[in-house]
Amino acid sequence: MNKTQLLIDKLFHKMFPNWVKYLQKDLSDCKSVLDLGCGFNSFIEYCDVPYSVGIDLHEPSIEESKEKRIHNHYFKADIRTLKLKPKSFDAVIAIAVIEHMTKEEGLALIPKMERWAKKKVIISTPNGFIRHEAIHDNPLQVHVTGWDASEFGELGFKVNGMFGLKQLRGYEGYEKYKPAFLWEIISGITQYVTYHFPRLAFILYARKDKIN
């Protein structure tokens, strides 16, 4: 990306905030966050969270995340069998995680997340099934299931659409058209529509506030 593209990109994100801005806002009142399936590059890095714990089953990803000092503490564990005390964290998040699980496993995990959270639960996942193969020698990266907005709505979540129109994305979620830089901007602009109509979006952003 040249200097002109960098300048345009900077101005664009100032005019059209990406989904990380919504995550930052949702976590702004949280002092502790549990990041399930944190991976090697969690978006928590861009949030002002005093204390966070990352959990992942892929040890190389944990080690890489440790080097970046994204979380305060890390645990290698299978989130499908994880056991924690109720209300252990202000927020429990699963960013790009449940699509790597069977539907049954995902539906079993969500109520656990609600029990572990004091204030809110946040989940993001592709809208529908998106093919994705293993990366970084991590078989856990393979996509297994697809989810739609209505499923989260039935579970009491508020759902918004992120990353613009799904129709603009191709294999593994990359921009379908060229030049990718231009279509990334166009995709960002369409988020003004998909935010309110998540069924059209590439990514679903679901959140539920706990009422204690």
Language-model features: locations:
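Conserved SAM-binding loop
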Residues: 22-130, 206
